[in-house]
Amino acid sequence: MERFTRLYPDRADGLTALDVVAALPGNAPDDRPWVCLNMIATADGRASIKGRAGNIANQADYELFHATRARMDGILVGAETIRVESYGRTINNAPARERRVREGLPADAVSVVATRRVSLPADVGLLRAPENTVIVLTPSEDGELPAEAAATVRYLREPDMAAGVRRLRGEHGLRALVCEGGPNLNATLLPAGLVDELHLVYAPKLAGGHDPLTILGGEVLDPPIELDLVTLHESGGYLYARYGVRTA
């Protein structure tokens, strides 16, 4: 088990990933889930190496990533990220599932897959795990995931992302979501005022390259969205920043 040092707002040593996420989630708004983006980037701003964010991470980040998931009702993610990052069972260890049950949550978090076209192959690990519940959030009026999917699959066909996120609260009871990207999904959520916090890992790596993929795609934000630092932790040279997203 990796250890973290809290650097801000005060110093504390020897913390575990569970300690770091103990205050999560925040208070949900009245009409939608509380949403945090959980992202990683190299020191020069790249959100992936060789196409995968997982190639940037270390063991401490892996533990914090899964500890964050385990505090949430659901995981919001784009279909391409699921394919590239090889998603499987949402809560991947028994102790975390047991903690969730003790805290009144289902053993596994719900996966919310945001996709313009309903297109995931049957061999994706997320669909092969019978314990998973998958909600497909899509503007498409047709299309379904492969019938041989072992996971429980539901569809939320909604052309407006903000309305879709609100329906996740009203119709599916999801009060807290972690969004794991990718950048285009992030760029849809943030300008729409649907994100409450950004959890950003700064990796001590330089990747280089032309036109690097960053954590936020889409058009340039004008004006930029302002952030407030809530906590800052360190482990193995990696920095783990938790920001509040300022509302307009």
Annotate the PLM regions.
Residues 1-248:
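Enzymes that bind and transform nitrogen-containing heteroaromatic metabolites
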